[in-house]
Amino acid sequence: MKTKIIVIVGPTAVGKTALAIEVAKRFNGEVVSGDSQQVYRGLDIGTAKASPEEQAAVLHHLIDVREITESYSAFDFVSEAKMTIEDIHSRGKLAIIAGGTGLYIQSLLEGYHLGGETPHEEILAYRASLEPYSDEELAHLVEQAGLEIPQFNRRRAMRALEIAHFGQDLENQETLYEPLIICLDDERSQLYERINHRVDLMFEAGLLDEAKWLFDHSPNVQAAKGIGYKELFPYFRGEQTFEEASESLKQATRRFAKRQLTWFRNRMQVTFYQIGESGVQDRILSQIEEFLDD
């Protein structure tokens, strides 16, 4: 029997952490972060980690598990998340995956092989190389490769191209989990307003000092490439004013949110909820209850 898990995804600033905590309290659960940046110690504000009070109220996993000088990949996430979910389940609790790194979460849910002859990073690099292509361009690649896909969709096209490229199906046919995937969304203007406001709050909380610490110590590491830090480096180098760097960060975050939504919409089977609608949290909790009772 597959392990039932709750997955909460969505763009940045939409309220994933708050919902995950509420779900954990309601259904005796623990939260597993599905965020590629929250793994780094010392990067708290720019990665929007759950506050110490929130982490004290509900146990969070895969936060602060790497130093800023260490790398972290989808391979690492899948390996560690699997062990974490198994531990949570063994204690009779519900695992709630919450985050915005679509590649990591999709890799976990679809049961990608972590062994085999083809290096996992090579597989992920190939998948990432297909992301910029439009549906029409993917269809053309499929045709060029001599492949046939009944009822074309983006996911089928990418899987077919992957199998043709590597000569084997690199996904497990049997996954470990039965997920309920909830994707939070908001009206675009409202979401962008939330993003801008959250960036302002981050600066008030000390983001500039946190980013300067990273800039002074390790400006070229993987951790420094995440949105929330690298946009401020031109300011530290004297190439931009603070106002310019702040606006650059807000713009980059808005663009990132758009890419996140595109990923979840095209690559994962999610149930969308508009956070601005009346009674949305009650409807989400009811759906989770029905899913767990089924």
Curated annotation (Swiss-Prot):
Needed co-factor(s): Mg(2+)
Highest taxon, organism lineage: Bacteria
Site annotation Interaction with substrate tRNA: residues: 101, 127
Sequence positions that bind substrate: 12-17
Keyword Nucleotide-binding assigned: yes
Pfam families listed in its UniProt record: IPPT (PF01715)
Enzyme Commission number(s) from the entry: 2.5.1.75
Gene Ontology molecular function terms on file: ATP binding; tRNA dimethylallyltransferase activity
Keywords: ATP-binding, Magnesium, Nucleotide-binding, Transferase, tRNA processing
Assembly description: Monomer.
Family per record: Belongs to the IPP transferase family.
Function according to Swiss-Prot or TrEMBL: Catalyzes the transfer of a dimethylallyl group onto the adenine at position 37 in tRNAs that read codons beginning with uridine, leading to the formation of N6-(dimethylallyl)adenosine (i(6)A).
Name of the protein in question: tRNA dimethylallyltransferase
Lineage: Bacteria, Bacillati, Bacillota, Bacilli, Lactobacillales
